[in-house]
Amino acid sequence: SPMYVEKFNVLQHPKYTEKLCKELAERFRDQNVELVIGPMTGGILLAHEVGKALGTRAIFTEREKGVMTLRRGFKIEPGTRVLIVEDIVTTGGSVQEVVNVVNQSGGEIVGVGLLVNRSGGKAEFGVPHEKVQALLNLEVPTYKPEECPLCKDGIAMTERGSKHIK
Protein backbone atom coordinates (compact mmCIF):
# COMPACT_ATOMS: atom_id res chain seq x y z
CA SER A 1 0.00 0.00 0.00
CA PRO A 2 1.33 3.47 -0.79
CA MET A 3 -0.20 4.96 2.37
CA TYR A 4 0.30 4.14 6.04
CA VAL A 5 -2.09 5.43 8.69
CA GLU A 6 -0.56 5.46 12.20
CA LYS A 7 -3.51 5.18 14.58
CA PHE A 8 -1.42 5.73 17.68
CA ASN A 9 -0.66 9.30 16.61
CA VAL A 10 -4.27 9.96 17.64
CA LEU A 11 -4.85 7.22 20.22
CA GLN A 12 -1.96 8.48 22.37
CA HIS A 13 -4.13 11.51 23.21
CA PRO A 14 -6.99 10.48 25.53
CA LYS A 15 -9.06 13.59 24.79
CA TYR A 16 -9.01 12.93 21.03
CA THR A 17 -9.63 9.22 21.49
CA GLU A 18 -12.60 10.01 23.72
CA LYS A 19 -14.01 12.51 21.21
CA LEU A 20 -13.71 10.10 18.28
CA CYS A 21 -15.23 7.25 20.27
CA LYS A 22 -18.15 9.41 21.40
CA GLU A 23 -18.83 10.20 17.73
CA LEU A 24 -18.68 6.50 16.89
CA ALA A 25 -20.99 5.69 19.82
CA GLU A 26 -23.55 8.27 18.64
CA ARG A 27 -23.83 6.48 15.30
CA PHE A 28 -25.06 3.37 17.13
CA ARG A 29 -26.93 4.93 20.07
CA ASP A 30 -30.34 3.79 18.76
CA GLN A 31 -29.21 0.16 18.37
CA ASN A 32 -29.61 -0.76 22.07
CA VAL A 33 -26.02 -1.98 22.26
CA GLU A 34 -25.42 -4.27 25.24
CA LEU A 35 -21.75 -5.04 24.63
CA VAL A 36 -18.88 -3.43 22.72
CA ILE A 37 -16.03 -5.63 21.53
CA GLY A 38 -12.82 -4.97 19.62
CA PRO A 39 -9.69 -6.90 18.70
CA MET A 40 -6.44 -6.45 20.58
CA THR A 41 -4.56 -3.93 20.38
CA GLY A 42 -6.20 -0.70 19.20
CA GLY A 43 -9.65 -2.23 19.52
CA ILE A 44 -9.20 -2.44 23.30
CA LEU A 45 -9.03 1.34 23.67
CA LEU A 46 -11.91 1.87 21.27
CA ALA A 47 -14.15 -0.74 22.89
CA HIS A 48 -13.52 0.80 26.30
CA GLU A 49 -14.24 4.37 25.20
CA VAL A 50 -17.26 3.50 23.04
CA GLY A 51 -18.59 1.28 25.83
CA LYS A 52 -18.15 4.14 28.29
CA ALA A 53 -20.02 6.52 25.97
CA LEU A 54 -22.87 4.01 25.56
CA GLY A 55 -22.90 2.92 29.21
CA THR A 56 -22.23 -0.72 28.32
CA ARG A 57 -19.72 -3.43 29.05
CA ALA A 58 -16.62 -3.54 26.83
CA ILE A 59 -14.41 -6.55 26.12
CA PHE A 60 -11.78 -7.57 23.58
CA THR A 61 -10.61 -10.56 21.60
CA GLU A 62 -7.03 -11.69 21.32
CA ARG A 63 -5.15 -14.36 19.44
CA GLU A 64 -4.32 -17.63 21.10
CA LYS A 65 -2.16 -19.93 18.96
CA GLY A 66 -3.04 -17.78 15.95
CA VAL A 67 -6.81 -17.91 16.47
CA MET A 68 -8.89 -14.91 17.60
CA THR A 69 -10.72 -15.84 20.78
CA LEU A 70 -12.26 -14.61 24.02
CA ARG A 71 -9.97 -15.03 27.02
CA ARG A 72 -9.67 -13.62 30.54
CA GLY A 73 -13.12 -14.89 31.49
CA PHE A 74 -14.90 -12.77 28.87
CA LYS A 75 -18.21 -14.20 27.67
CA ILE A 76 -20.91 -13.21 25.22
CA GLU A 77 -24.30 -14.56 26.20
CA PRO A 78 -26.53 -15.76 23.34
CA GLY A 79 -28.76 -12.95 22.08
CA THR A 80 -26.53 -10.15 23.40
CA ARG A 81 -26.66 -7.08 21.13
CA VAL A 82 -23.01 -6.53 20.16
CA LEU A 83 -21.21 -3.60 18.55
CA ILE A 84 -17.81 -4.45 17.05
CA VAL A 85 -15.24 -1.64 16.91
CA GLU A 86 -11.88 -1.46 15.18
CA ASP A 87 -9.35 1.28 14.56
CA ILE A 88 -8.26 0.78 10.94
CA VAL A 89 -9.62 -1.65 8.36
CA THR A 90 -7.61 -2.52 5.27
CA THR A 91 -8.75 -6.01 4.30
CA GLY A 92 -11.25 -6.59 7.11
CA GLY A 93 -9.47 -9.70 8.36
CA SER A 94 -9.40 -8.81 12.07
CA VAL A 95 -13.02 -7.65 12.02
CA GLN A 96 -14.02 -10.91 10.30
CA GLU A 97 -12.30 -12.83 13.09
CA VAL A 98 -14.22 -10.86 15.73
CA VAL A 99 -17.47 -11.41 13.77
CA ASN A 100 -16.74 -15.15 13.90
CA VAL A 101 -16.19 -15.05 17.67
CA VAL A 102 -19.45 -13.14 18.23
CA ASN A 103 -21.40 -15.46 15.93
CA GLN A 104 -19.97 -18.58 17.59
CA SER A 105 -21.09 -17.18 20.96
CA GLY A 106 -24.63 -16.54 19.70
CA GLY A 107 -24.36 -12.76 19.95
CA GLU A 108 -26.37 -10.49 17.66
CA ILE A 109 -24.15 -8.06 15.73
CA VAL A 110 -25.94 -4.71 15.58
CA GLY A 111 -23.08 -2.86 13.90
CA VAL A 112 -19.41 -2.38 13.15
CA GLY A 113 -17.82 0.97 14.00
CA LEU A 114 -14.47 1.94 12.49
CA LEU A 115 -12.20 4.92 12.92
CA VAL A 116 -10.78 4.50 9.41
CA ASN A 117 -11.91 2.25 6.58
CA ARG A 118 -9.02 2.15 4.09
CA SER A 119 -10.80 -0.32 1.80
CA GLY A 120 -13.12 2.17 0.12
CA GLY A 121 -15.99 0.06 1.46
CA LYS A 122 -14.70 -3.09 -0.24
CA ALA A 123 -13.73 -5.00 2.91
CA GLU A 124 -16.24 -7.76 3.59
CA PHE A 125 -16.80 -9.35 6.96
CA GLY A 126 -20.29 -10.79 6.73
CA VAL A 127 -22.06 -7.75 8.15
CA PRO A 128 -24.46 -5.78 5.90
CA HIS A 129 -22.88 -2.54 4.66
CA GLU A 130 -25.67 -0.45 6.20
CA LYS A 131 -24.56 -1.67 9.65
CA VAL A 132 -20.96 -0.49 9.10
CA GLN A 133 -20.01 3.07 10.04
CA ALA A 134 -16.56 4.62 9.62
CA LEU A 135 -15.52 8.07 10.79
CA LEU A 136 -13.18 8.27 7.78
CA ASN A 137 -13.45 6.36 4.51
CA LEU A 138 -10.39 6.15 2.28
CA GLU A 139 -9.76 4.25 -0.90
CA VAL A 140 -6.17 3.10 -0.62
CA PRO A 141 -4.87 0.38 -2.95
CA THR A 142 -3.52 -2.73 -1.29
CA TYR A 143 -1.11 -4.93 -3.21
CA LYS A 144 0.04 -8.51 -3.08
CA PRO A 145 3.88 -8.56 -2.81
CA GLU A 146 4.30 -9.64 -6.44
CA GLU A 147 2.11 -6.73 -7.63
CA CYS A 148 3.47 -3.99 -5.34
CA PRO A 149 5.07 -1.08 -7.26
CA LEU A 150 7.35 -0.26 -4.31
CA CYS A 151 8.53 -3.88 -4.16
CA LYS A 152 9.20 -3.85 -7.92
CA ASP A 153 11.33 -0.72 -7.43
CA GLY A 154 13.32 -2.48 -4.69
CA ILE A 155 11.93 -0.37 -1.84
CA ALA A 156 11.56 -2.69 1.13
CA MET A 157 8.67 -1.77 3.41
CA THR A 158 10.08 -3.25 6.59
CA GLU A 159 9.55 -0.24 8.85
CA ARG A 160 6.53 1.85 9.68
CA GLY A 161 6.35 5.29 8.19
CA SER A 162 7.89 6.76 5.07
CA LYS A 163 11.23 8.18 6.25
CA HIS A 164 13.16 5.58 4.26
CA ILE A 165 11.39 6.35 0.95
CA LYS A 166 13.28 8.81 -1.20
Model-derived regions: residue spans:
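PRPP-associated nucleotide enzymes
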Residues: S1-K166
